[in-house]
């Protein structure tokens, strides 16, 4: 060992000496003596490794307390950190999909703080059913005879098939064999549910006679799957649920539908593209309809199944129902969200998903122009900051073809180097509240459709 190396090792402090320093008192109070000591030992090992490798001390050896504080602060951050979503995707799967209404947030807080009547019937002091309150609301909203709640729509489809068609055939059009995120495929779900998939028609054209010819003594269901995350256009043919229900009645085979996104209101009244609604399919005679709680409905992650009473009863009594059931927080949030639908005149104000989807491009552009000046003052030396029109998307596989006119703040490096955009985006991701945009066409775009808290936005970007 050289004299220089020996000198570097001698500069490493003893843990006891560090802990006696006043700057470590607050760290021990905040993070605990055990964790602080554990980290100091780790850092000493790191420092020795640096000395062995490069004959230098790490820069942080100049202020051990500051480095410990920085590391423990980062370590203490929640894995689920709040971010500012300026990607232009309203229902961003990677960012948690639907923002919850204040009523839903309050309902969850209450359910977490106190015992609740999850499965307790106050009328007869006996055991109740956890889906009962939501079933009443869903019957009222959709016109269905009964309802069942599980933890997501994939689970809803699995339960629906396992409880009503295990060991039998399910007839589906080839044009509806969808795959959603995470390689979740309808054929795979059928296999897990114990069903046999009977494909009919072609990718772009399926006729009523295709279903008719497929039905046999082992057919359990005729199934429709709403292709909410893609669109087949051009030379196409598909039969709707009403026509399929008529055929099912003739052949004595129930019809079920996986609706996917599941809007409970006609979106066209807000100037948005219309999506099929569960109540329309129930009115058409579909036996079971499944849809998501955290997409267009604007609630928590949940799988909702509405339909005929006798078929819902089969779902409720199936062993998978207990494995897939929703917890009290989900049910509390979903109930509060569904109650908002009982007052449709206030829905676009109180339901964040609908409020963000219905923001006009003109309002968003005015907001962008208002925010442009302080950002130019802060970033103008390196970037051209402009207000530009853009197109938002709904996201989470909802209305895949349709885009929403919006406005964005764009950042273009004066030197044209893409690495500067990557660096800027990375800096914003490291903020206390990360700001998430998207890089496209030589610019960093901040689509302001989902920006409601301007003060927090400026506090972050002007740091």
UniProtKB/Swiss-Prot annotation:
Keywords: Cytoplasm, Protein biosynthesis, Pyridoxal phosphate, Selenium, Transferase. The modification N6-(pyridoxal phosphate)lysine is found at residue 295. Pathway: Aminoacyl-tRNA biosynthesis; selenocysteinyl-tRNA(Sec) biosynthesis; selenocysteinyl-tRNA(Sec) from L-seryl-tRNA(Sec) (bacterial route): step 1/1. GO terms for cellular component: cytoplasm. Its cofactor is pyridoxal 5'-phosphate. It is an enzyme of class 2 (transferase). It catalyses: L-seryl-tRNA(Sec) + selenophosphate + H(+) = L-selenocysteinyl-tRNA(Sec) + phosphate. Its EC number is 2.9.1.1. SUPFAM superfamilies: PLP-dependent transferases. GO terms for molecular function: L-seryl-tRNA(Sec) selenium transferase activity. Gene3D superfamilies: 3.90.1150.180, Type I PLP-dependent aspartate aminotransferase-like (Major domain). Its main location: cytoplasm. InterPro entries: PyrdxlP-dep_Trfase, PyrdxlP-dep_Trfase_major, SelA-like, SelA_trans, SelA_trans_N_dom. Signal peptide: none annotated. GO terms for biological process: conversion of seryl-tRNAsec to selenocys-tRNAsec; selenocysteine incorporation. Homodecamer; pentamer of dimers. Binds only one seryl-tRNA(Sec) per dimer. Belongs to the SelA family. Converts seryl-tRNA(Sec) to selenocysteinyl-tRNA(Sec) required for selenoprotein biosynthesis. HAMAP family: SelA. This is L-seryl-tRNA(Sec) selenium transferase. The gene is selA.
């Amino acid at each position: 060992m050289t004299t220089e190396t020996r000198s570097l090792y001698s500069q490493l402090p003893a843990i006891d000496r560090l802990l006696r320093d006043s700057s470590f008192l607050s760290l021990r109070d905040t993070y605990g003596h055990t964790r602080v000591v554990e980290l100091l030992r780790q850092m000493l090992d790191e420092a020795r490794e640096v000395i062995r490798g490069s004959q230098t001390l790490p820069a942080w050896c100049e202020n051990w307390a500051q480095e410990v504080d920085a590391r423990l602060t980062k370590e203490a951050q929640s894995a689920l950190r709040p971010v500012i979503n300026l990607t232009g995707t309203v229902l961003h799967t990677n960012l948690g999909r639907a923002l919850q209404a204040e009523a839903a947030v309050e309902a969850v807080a209450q359910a977490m703080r106190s015992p609740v009547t999850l499965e307790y019937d106050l009328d007869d002091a006996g055991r109740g059913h956890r889906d009962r309150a939501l079933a009443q609301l869903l019957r009222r909203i959709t016109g269905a005879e009964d309802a069942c709640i599980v933890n997501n729509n994939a689970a809803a489809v699995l339960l629906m098939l396992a409880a009503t068609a295990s060991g039998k055939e399910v007839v589906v059009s080839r044009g509806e064999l969808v795959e959603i995120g995470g390689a979740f495929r309808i054929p795979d779900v059928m296999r897990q549910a114990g069903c046999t998939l009977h494909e009919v028609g072609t990718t772009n054209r399926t006729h009523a006679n295709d279903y008719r010819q497929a039905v046999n003594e082992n057919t359990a269901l005729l199934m429709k799957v709403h292709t909410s995350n893609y669109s087949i256009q051009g030379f196409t043919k598909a039969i709707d649920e009403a026509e399929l229900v008529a055929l099912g009645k003739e052949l004595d085979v129930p019809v079920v539908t996986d609706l996917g996104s599941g809007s409970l209101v006609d979106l066209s009244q807000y100037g948005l593209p219309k999506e099929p609604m569960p109540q329309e399919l129930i009115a058409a005679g579909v036996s079971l309809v499944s849809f998501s709680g955290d997409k267009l409905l604007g609630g928590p992650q949940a799988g909702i199944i509405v339909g005929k009473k006798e078929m819902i009863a089969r779902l409720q009594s199936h062993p998978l129902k207990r494995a897939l059931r929703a917890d009290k927080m989900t049910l509390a949030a979903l109930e509060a969200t569904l109650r908002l639908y009982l007052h449709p005149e206030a829905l676009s104000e109180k339901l964040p998903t609908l409020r963000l989807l219905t923001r006009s491009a003109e309002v968003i552009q005015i907001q962008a122009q208002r925010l442009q000046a302080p950002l130019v003052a802060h970033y103008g030396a390196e970037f051209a900051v402009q207000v530009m029109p853009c197109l938002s998307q709904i996201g989470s596989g909802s209305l895949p073809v349709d885009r929403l006119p919006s406005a964005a703040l764009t950042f273009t490096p004066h030197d044209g180097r893409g690495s500067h955009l990557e660096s800027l985006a990375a800096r914003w991701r490291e903020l206390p509240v990360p700001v998430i945009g998207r890089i496209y066409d030589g610019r960093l775009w901040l689509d302001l459709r989902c920006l409601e808290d301007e003060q927090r936005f400026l506090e972050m970007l002007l740091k």
